[in-house]
């Protein structure tokens, strides 16, 4: 039923949700980046002429320093004995603490630019997107970089002069997760050797390489690849660490012979660690703790503790006698800048770790002071931007109590006194400088969030207005069908809302607000004007909707709905909440009056079994037994369904079903062989990969076409077709229990259809029972969430295991791997859309009734998550709150898509004893 009112709802709804989806990035995650700062040189007397930055991608701190037992040889040993010898004799070491997300791009940005890239970067992509801020490479004389095509280009393309950064990269196809990861690192060392050799044949190159201020960046991807493929406790991962340790002394010897001046500084670290499951991205300590070892020109030798110092994490390192100097990852950029005497990156927030520096205290203090001035420069530029766009400006309270100029004067006075021999003031000067840096960073956050309260109020009115606006349209479309034309707005309404709009738009204009802010304001003005004009429709529609129910029952229904929605909100953070709600729904048929014992018992059993999935760990470990069990259950359930519908199908359809069941069995066999081969480190058999893709394609595309040639329009037949169409694809993409969920989720919805049909048949009144529509909509929306959280959560997707795609795609291909992951996520929604479509037909609901009602209520979730967004703390928490908000705000549109998809999947389907069919 596509009338004017519904068209308005869809057009306004799509625009509203798309704009408000983006609102969090305009409000919460405005980039703190500022431009136009003056640079500050780290030191005029650099201790090193060049620097080698060696990054072991995905290398954990404990693996680097700990004594481990090799899983193949059984030998207990230190994997990196040479690096350990540096720590004990020649280097300063510590743990570099990363921030979340513990991914390659933000990790490298932090250590090379000294800047923790904000979440708004996710809107631009993270691989090929060049960094749009200053970096250590940008300040160097020249940078020679070797390694992965996922990392090197973003610093080359983002440099002020791209010719300043040279890159030597392997092709993406080189990143084969089933082959030896050591080859990736061997490429780096081999091409560095080639560069040195070429310089002996080219005088220009030789001159360029020997310039002061050069940087050599070695990006070693091997550990990350081995960790993803085989876990960080595997022989492959350990062997890769040993290979790196073997190559570093060779590298040092070649560098010393080539330059022959002992003026080279070396930094060895990692961008992030690796979880026990072979993933990273979240805030687990195994992901955030990385090694940092620094040696060479300008760097301190190890300092011995007067007494052994260790903790539970480091007790097996046998380094308790050596002082450990931990840093934040962004501090590495400041350290590297000092070592070769270049400017601090203009956007750096890193603090110079003076414990690593070998030099005069006055030089170190001067460098730290310039570090603080560089950060303060960002604050001053940002403050000027804010002052220029405000009617009234209120300065950050800590700088009101003590101005930044006062801080600078005090520090300069202390530095002057220290230079005159008062060395006892050094610690006071360092403490005061660090205090200035900390307050400056807090002030930057204050300026970035200066207009939060105003714009968040506008967005809140927008969400609440949409809820009432869409509910009024639902009432007009399905309950008060005699209301055709909208009520005319009164002159008072025009005057009031027009005045408010002019005033608020003027404020936005004065604040130099972007275009999106005007749209955020336009929607609440339109919604509340519409609500005010149609307030009589809202009153009469609610009265008709709850016709025949007592006031206390209305209150109970309202409380129940809000409780379910708030439970869903809580379930986004704690999946066990979905278990609780599913178990409560186990009594749903009995509460609604269904008294058939077999129906109720089967429903309770299925509900309890389905509820267990949200208790399982979202990060899964490959389990072939669970995959086998799920495949067997899918095959048995298909045979049982065929037995139940055998009288409704002809021989052609029966033969197609037999082929589909055979494809499920064949895919199970292919999955078994692929898993065994990959677990034995024998790679993916070519024939298994080809067979997997053939079955994948045939089941998803060929079989539906064969059914379409001679269609059977019975709804039970159509549901079985869809169930078997998706099953093979889901099996090969399953890591452990996902296919079991697929089987039980389908069983649950099939039973739900029959239960709702029985409830419908029990009603004798002629009037439309809107409470059943309400119940179906709420349960349907709940199942929309279960379809996602039943097999994982946001965090498990951000760090998904490669087992789910390596059986089809062993070569690294982020686009195709992402597409396969999305297919796996979408399949349960396809089943849900089919069942909602069947419910729509069996219960004689008008088309789009369910989606329209859900759309009017679902933004209860969006409003919750809007205020639950986090900008501080663990980046895992920050990322999850962003994803939760996006999932919630897209639920409205997704529900409509599901119902449209249901119409497509159920085209011409006939419900027995009903004359209605899909159009």
Curated annotation (Swiss-Prot):
Transmembrane spans: 10-30, 458-478, 489-509, 513-533, 554-574, 577-597, 599-619, 627-647, 656-676, 688-708, 721-741, 777-797, 808-828, 849-869, 886-906
Subcellular location: Endoplasmic reticulum membrane; Golgi apparatus membrane; Vacuole membrane
Post-translational modification: N-glycosylated.
GO molecular function: mannose-ethanolamine phosphotransferase activity
Cytoplasmic side: 1-9, 479-488, 534-553, 598, 648-655, 709-720, 798-807, 870-885
Family of the protein in this entry: Belongs to the PIGG/PIGN/PIGO family. PIGN subfamily.
Entry protein name: GPI ethanolamine phosphate transferase 1
Source species: Saccharomyces cerevisiae (strain ATCC 204508 / S288c) (Baker's yeast)
